Amino acid sequence: MIEADRLISAEPINEEEILDRAIRPKLLTEYVGQPHVREQMEIFIQAAKQRGDALDHLLIFGPPGLGKTTLANIVANEMGVNLRTTSGPVLEKAGDLAAMLTNLEPHDVLFIDEIHRLSPVVEEVLYPAMEDYQLDIMIGEGPAARSIKLDLPPFTLVGATTRAGSLTSPLRDRFGIVQRLEFYQVADLQHIVSRSANCLGLDLSEEGAHQVARRARGTPRIANRLLRRVRDFAEVRANGVINGEVAMQALDMLNVDAEGFDYMDRKLLLAIIDKFTGGPVGLDNLAAAIGEERETIEDVIEPFLIQQGFIQRTPRGRMATNHAYKHFGMVREE
């Protein structure tokens, strides 16, 4: 199954992006959840503005869909500067990055998503740009080649990644601010769902918002996606009114259970329980058993299951916990 096909995938889907921009918070005062991140960023941004400096370079990491792009937008809005957006895979050559850097205005924010996927040659260009606001460019070829330095305006690099451990140490060490985004609490997600419903003009009850939030895997992007599908159900079956019962009916129809698990989550858990007697099982064997890429299991499916206590990582492989057995009404055989 392709990850983007999953309703509860935390990866963005193209047709959602315009709508997401409409409901995305613009300022820290509108930002819900991540209280430690919000408090720290308020202080760092205010201090930079008082000094008249660019904000220090910021690395944001955590599972997909938790608001890394949203936070980058908020930083630019709070600083009152432009936001330039790109991603690691797009910056194939050093010249691609150089073109973006030379077009920055003072204190602008350059946002690089999937920064762990930068090529080594592009990363080398980034080091002096981040540290000294300088761009080293090679002119000419062969023996006549020479290096010239171009001064860059002070700017803020915001890097986002789901795999902070894949960043090289020299790159990671150049970020003055590092923020980890955690899975959201249900109460915070309920607030986000209610705000999104208000932006979309939906008739959503408090219990309806709660039902959507509790099945959203701690992820705002999934919560907003589920809300849109529940809206479709309500418009056809319930005159557009989304109460708790309508939300539950819609989510049950969508095959998203009370824990927020979909077909792939249940398939993975049942594979460990049934095919590997509860584990431990290596990641490659597990990927082969469910027909999924190991990277998708490791980066997308597994983190929430581990965080919720359904899977345990051990030196010998993945194991299903007693919590997983109870979810399926099973008892672990000793």
UniProtKB/Swiss-Prot annotation:
Residues 185-255 are annotated as: Small ATPAse domain (RuvB-S). DNA binds at residues 294, 313, 318. It comes from the Bacteria. ATP binds at residues 23-24, 65, 68-70, 131-133, 174, 184, 221. SUPFAM superfamilies: P-loop containing nucleoside triphosphate hydrolases (SSF52540), Winged helix' DNA-binding domain (SSF46785). It is found in: Cytoplasm. Mg(2+) binds at residue 69. Its EC number is 3.6.4.-. Residues 258-334 are annotated as: Head domain (RuvB-H). It catalyses: ATP + H2O = ADP + phosphate + H(+). InterPro entries: AAA+_ATPase, AAA_lid_4, DNA_helicase_Holl-junc_RuvB, P-loop_NTPase, RuvB-like_N, RuvB_C, WH-like_DNA-bd_sf, WH_DNA-bd_sf. One of its GO terms (molecular function) is ATP binding. SMART domains: AAA. GO terms for biological process: DNA recombination; DNA repair. Keywords: ATP-binding, Cytoplasm, DNA damage, DNA recombination, DNA repair, DNA-binding, Hydrolase, Nucleotide-binding. Residues 4-184 are annotated as: Large ATPase domain (RuvB-L). GO terms for cellular component: cytoplasm; Holliday junction resolvase complex. Has 3 domains, the large (RuvB-L) and small ATPase (RuvB-S) domains and the C-terminal head (RuvB-H) domain. The head domain binds DNA, while the ATPase domains jointly bind ATP, ADP or are empty depending on the state of the subunit in the translocation cycle. During a single DNA translocation step the structure of each domain remains the same, but their relative positions change. The RuvA-RuvB-RuvC complex processes Holliday junction (HJ) DNA during genetic recombination and DNA repair, while the RuvA-RuvB complex plays an important role in the rescue of blocked DNA replication forks via replication fork reversal (RFR). RuvA specifically binds to HJ cruciform DNA, conferring on it an open structure. The RuvB hexamer acts as an ATP-dependent pump, pulling dsDNA into and through the RuvAB complex. RuvB forms 2 homohexamers on either side of HJ DNA bound by 1 or 2 RuvA tetramers; 4 subunits per hexamer contact DNA at a time. Homohexamer. Forms an RuvA(8)-RuvB(12)-Holliday junction (HJ) complex. HJ DNA is sandwiched between 2 RuvA tetramers; dsDNA enters through RuvA and exits via RuvB. An RuvB hexamer assembles on each DNA strand where it exits the tetramer. Each RuvB hexamer is contacted by two RuvA subunits (via domain III) on 2 adjacent RuvB subunits; this complex drives branch migration. In the full resolvosome a probable DNA-RuvA(4)-RuvB(12)-RuvC(2) complex forms which resolves the HJ. This is Holliday junction branch migration complex subunit RuvB. It comes from Serratia proteamaculans (strain 568). The lineage of its organism: Bacteria, Pseudomonadati, Pseudomonadota, Gammaproteobacteria, Enterobacterales.
